[in-house]
Design a protein with these regions (language model features):
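ABC ATPase NBD Q-loop/coupling interface
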Residues: 1-7
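C-terminal boundary and immediately downstream tail of ABC-type ATPase nucleotide-binding domains
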Residues: 152-175, 205
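ABC ATPase nucleotide-binding domains
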Residues: 7-9, 22-159
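Non-catalytic connector elements of ABC transporters
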Residues: 167, 178-277
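Catalytic "switch" loops of ABC-type ATPases
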Residues: 13-18, 123
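Nucleotide-sugar-dependent glycosyltransferase donor-binding/catalytic pocket residues
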Residues: 17, 153, 228
Length: 277
């Protein structure tokens, strides 16, 4: 198939607007290419409203910000009504406060228009939200391809765990088909992602949401760091064997702990998805 007949659009990470055209003219380049396609319903005003760029249509690229230029590039790729849309870090220069709104609207417009889209991003949250499937590529190799839920909760390798950087791998011993033991946390129950012989020495993945705060618990560890993330805190706890374990707590929780305080972990510990390596 000749390039001009492939009906593929691409939005680059860098500003790819023509400097001698206004934003509007940049967006409308190629807009008539697929005007006869009846099964697509993306229109100019819908895209302008989606990306909130009506006030910059008559400006030139050197007169707008990097985030505005990136939104204009994204608009240009959408206006062609492609069968396949390729997006390279499409929202990397967009302010976080506006980014989530664009993601929500973009997801709706891609779904309603039935545009197949491949997005390259280093933002795992963006990939999980926008993608029906996620591929983790490391060192030019596809390590895992699955739906977002499984990529997060059931990573298939230590490499994927390290890439997502959401939890910690701790040493443990399998004590039954549904339990294992860790020196600091004690007994942990749940459903294994794959069977291990009893007595196996494994590395257990502990995600921030796997452990629960309980001030009344006798299992307490020292808080060495606390990160405020708006709706939640991520505490880093230090165990007697010097493990650094992340724990998620809602920010509206009645009592927040400071560094060097003791933080209680609720018992018994149950993890729905026990992932071991």
């Amino acid at each position: 198939v000749e390039p001009e007949n492939r009906n593929i659009s691409l939005a680059f990470q860098e500003n790819s607007l023509f400097p001698h055209y206004t934003v509007e003219k940049n967006i409308l380049l190629g807009a008539d290419r697929n005007k006869d396609k009846k099964d697509k319903n993306v229109n100019f005003q819908e895209i302008i409203d989606l990306l909130d760029i009506s006030l910059i249509l008559n400006k030139f690229p050197h007169e707008i910000s990097a985030g505005e230029a990136q939104r204009a590039s994204l608009a240009r790729s959408l206006i062609t009504n492609p069968d396949l849309l390729l997006l390279d870090e499409p929202l990397s220069n967009v302010d976080q406060s506006f980014k989530e709104e664009i993601q929500e609207k973009l997801k709706k417009i891609l779904k309603s228009s039935k545009i197949t889209t491949i997005i390259v991003t280093h933002d795992s949250y963006e990939a999980f939200y926008l993608g029906s499937k996620c591929g983790i590529i490391l060192n030019q190799e596809l390590k895992q391809f699955d739906d977002p839920y499984n990529v997060y909760h059931l990573p298939n390798s230590i490499e994927v765990v390290n890439f997502l950087n959401r939890g910690i791998l701790i040493p443990a011993e399998v004590t039954s088909p549904k339990s294992l033991e860790n020196k600091d946390l004690g007994t942990i129950t749940g459903n294994f992602n794959k069977p291990f012989p009893i007595g196996s020495k494994v590395k257990l993945l502990v995600q921030p949401e796997d452990l629960h705060h309980d001030d009344q618990s006798n299992l307490k560890f020292e808080v060495i760091d606390r990160k405020f993330r708006g709706t939640n805190f991520i505490y880093t706890l230090k165990t007697p064997s010097n493990l650094l374990i992340p724990v998620f707590v809602h920010s509206h929780h009645i009592h927040q702990h400071e560094e060097n305080e003791k933080f209680g972990i609720k018992r018994p510990i149950h993890i729905d998805h026990i992932v071991c390596f």
